[in-house]
A protein has these predicted regions:
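Substrate-binding/catalytic lobe of Class I Rossmann-like enzymes that use SAM or dcSAM, i.e.
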Residues: 1-103, 111-113
């Protein structure tokens, strides 16, 4: 994560699901309505992005990006793909609701998927 925070998304904050839920419990009256872990399918997405990125590397160079940039993004995409495949990193959709929520979908289609 340090590589990602330093080189890919500087200044970002990447909390774990556990940290988000703990903060929710401490600081709000929100209720967890739905949580979907989609790390395994995101690994495939990252793989496809890396393949497309590498296939267009000449276009990337033509935009003025150097070899360091190409290596950094190739590494990032491969690193995250492996992390999601091995389940050492994760990504999730989290849906929370205020009190009074009665079960209707806030995001049509989300809970039916």
């Amino acid at each position: 994560v340090d590589f990602i925070k330093r080189h890919i998304f500087p200044g970002s904050f990447i909390p774990s699901v556990a940290a988000m839920l703990a903060a929710k419990t401490r600081s709000s009256d929100l209720a967890l309505v739905h949580l979907e872990d989609f790390g395994p399918s995101y690994a495939r997405t990252l793989h496809d992005w890396r393949e497309r990125f590498l296939a267009r590397r000449e276009d990337v160079r033509a935009q003025g990006f150097d070899e360091r940039f190409l290596r950094m993004w190739t590494f990032y995409l491969a690193y995250c793909e492996g992390g999601f495949r091995e389940r050492s990193i994760g990504v999730a959709h989290v849906l929370m609701a205020k009190p009074g929520y009665r079960g209707g979908s806030y995001l049509p289609g989300l809970l039916e998927a």
